[in-house]
Amino acid sequence: MVHLTKTLRFINNPGFRKFYYGLQGYNKYGLYYDDFYDYTDPAHLEAVRRLPPDLYDQHTYRVIRASQLEITKQFLPKEQWPSYEEDMDKGRFLTPYLDEVMKEKKEKEEWVNFLSKD
């Protein structure tokens, strides 16, 4: 148990998080964390549908640019890579919409369970 606690403390260390962010490599393509989502999950699709047009266009541009870079086996210049702080700030653009969709889904399930008790 002590070993697990030390491991969790190490993983939650901001220095380790920055190091791991650099290892993941999606920043080399100019992508943010929320640019990766499950295209088969209805909750994610609904959250993407609710994005404002400017955020949706920015997301689409980043994904297309990253696909083109991957096809040509290139990376963006280092000065265009999003930093860890930028990813934590701007890169979580889908999370509020996804949280809203999940709350609505939970509320619907509660109502169905409440109404089916009769």
From Swiss-Prot:
Q: Does the keyword Cell inner membrane apply?
A: no
**Which BP terms does GO give this entry?**
mitochondrial electron transport, ubiquinol to cytochrome c
Note down the stretches annotated as region IgE-binding. Immunodominant epitope: 1-32
| Compartments where located | Mitochondrion inner membrane
Q: Provide the membrane topology annotation.
A: Peripheral membrane protein
- Asked whether the keyword Membrane is assigned, the reply is yes
**Known InterPro entries for this protein?**
QCR7, QCR7_sf
What's the superkingdom here? Eukaryota
Sorted keywords for this record are:
Allergen, Electron transport, Membrane, Mitochondrion, Mitochondrion inner membrane, Respiratory chain, Transport
Principal place of residence = mitochondrion
Q: Which residues cross the membrane?
A: none
Query: What is known about its subunit structure?
Result: Component of the ubiquinol-cytochrome c oxidoreductase (cytochrome b-c1 complex, complex III, CIII), a multisubunit enzyme composed of 3 respiratory subunits cytochrome b, cytochrome c1 and Rieske protein, 2 core protein subunits, and additional low-molecular weight protein subunits. The complex exists as an obligatory dimer and forms supercomplexes (SCs) in the inner mitochondrial membrane with cytochrome c oxidase (complex IV, CIV).
Name the family: Belongs to the UQCRB/QCR7 family.
Function in brief: Component of the ubiquinol-cytochrome c oxidoreductase, a multisubunit transmembrane complex that is part of the mitochondrial electron transport chain which drives oxidative phosphorylation.
Q: What is this protein called?
A: Cytochrome b-c1 complex subunit 7
Source organism of the structure: Dermatophagoides pteronyssinus
